[in-house]
From Swiss-Prot:
Residues 194-203 are annotated as: G3 motif. Its cofactor is Mg(2+). It comes from Schizosaccharomyces pombe (strain 972 / ATCC 24843) (Fission yeast). This is Guanine nucleotide-binding protein alpha-2 subunit. Gene3D superfamilies: GI Alpha 1, domain 2-like (1.10.400.10), P-loop containing nucleotide triphosphate hydrolases (3.40.50.300). Its main location: membrane.
């Protein structure tokens, strides 16, 4: 029987520190000819989704056992998002019919303990509530703190809450579980051994470990285009715009002494969500200095310029940008064909053969 298992993202800091330091020490002892890639980006930029896509494209995907481990993660994403949705409805004073009000009550009162079965009633309540146009429209704007995949999970609430639920690949790609510390995936590109490290995106994570990767060959930096109207989740800077935070992080990375010789690959990610949001949320409301056309192409170019202009790229790196939708496997397959060429050329250059 499948269960709803609330996963804790907290832990003992000292144990986590020790574990990560041991990972780094072990990594340095391995073959130095291995090409190392560091996957970076602010929280919720899509880094972990990129890691999953690499596993799908280069590691034969997920085993059945691995697929089943995503059930509690996805159910937690769904339930937490549904509770957040109810809070938004209350805060905005959205008028609901009696059924909508009843559904909100069901969602608010549902607080499963670890080991408790999730039931079909909660799935039906979420599906019914999300079907109301007034509810859907109230989520637009920067005051919405829903995760990007919330609408997708709401549309699949009945399936996710089913006793016999088995996650699809799309479910897995859209699941969100904050990266704590470092995760690693190894794969091969044209006989070149790649080790990719995904470092936690939260401020407290990246500050601790970034200096440990001074010999990294390439950096893939992920940016969520969809974050132009959002504020940070983190307590240290709760009012800071998340796109501005990404620019600041990118600045600190590419101009760091540790990465002067690394190739820089920039993923402008979540393009699908960004394009839809621009129809409802004007970019200039959050970046009034932008004076261009209100078009997806013009605004995308402007955001790219914010990252690659000389005041940011003071180290004068060659930056290789790509527009990505991390949940779209076909898109990532095309993008990684180009990334592969960048990595191979850089490896040849390092070997003095290019």
């Amino acid at each position: 029987m499948t269960i709803f298992n609330g996963l804790s993202e907290s832990g003992e800091s000292k144990k986590l520190n020790s574990k990560i330091e041991k990972q780094i020490e072990n990594a340095s002892k391995k073959d130095k000819k291995i090409y190392k890639v560091l996957l970076l980006g602010a929280s919720d930029s899509g880094k972990s989704t990129i890691s999953k896509q690499i596993k799908i494209l280069n590691k034969n995907g997920f085993s059945q056992e691995e697929i089943m481990t995503f059930i509690p993660v996805i159910r937690r994403n769904l339930l937490e998002s549904a509770k957040t949705l109810v809070k938004i409805i209350v805060q905005k004073g959205i008028n609901l019919d009696p059924l909508g009000t009843h559904n909100c009550e069901i969602i608010e009162k549902f607080n499963p303990t670890p080991g408790e079965l999730i039931n079909a009633n909660i799935g039906q309540a979420i599906t019914s509530l999300w079907s109301a146009n007034s509810v859907r429209s109230c989520t637009y704007g920067n005051d919405s703190v829903l995760i990007d995949s919330a609408p997708y999970f709401f549309s699949r609430a009945d399936e996710i809450c089913s006793r016999h639920y088995v996650p699809t690949i799309d479910d897995i790609l859209r699941s969100r579980n904050s990266t704590l510390g470092i995760s690693e995936i190894s794969f091969t590109l044209d006989h070149l051994q790649i080790r990719m490290f995904d470092v936690g995106g939260q401020r407290t994570e990246r500050r601790k470990w970034i200096y440990c990767f001074e010999n990294v060959n390439s950096i893939i930096f992920c940016v969520s285009l969809n974050d132009y109207d959002k504020k940070l989740y983190e307590r240290a800077a709760p009012e800071r715009n998340r796109l501005v935070e990404s620019i600041s992080l990118f600045d600190s990375i590419i101009n760091s002494q540790w990465f002067m010789h690394s190739s820089i690959i920039l993923f402008l990610n979540k393009f699908d969500l960004f394009r839809k949001k621009l129809e409802h949320v004007p970019f200039q409301d959050y970046f009034p200095q932008y004076e261009g056309k209100n078009s997806v192409k013009s605004i995308t170019r402007y955001i790219l310029w914010l990252f690659v202009n000389p005041s940011i790229n003071r180290a004068k790196h060659n930056i290789y940008p790509h527009i990505t939708t991390a949940v779209d496997t076909s898109n990532i397959k095309v993008v990684f064909s180009a990334v592969k060429e960048t990595i191979l050329q850089h490896s040849l250059k390092e070997a003095g053969m290019f």
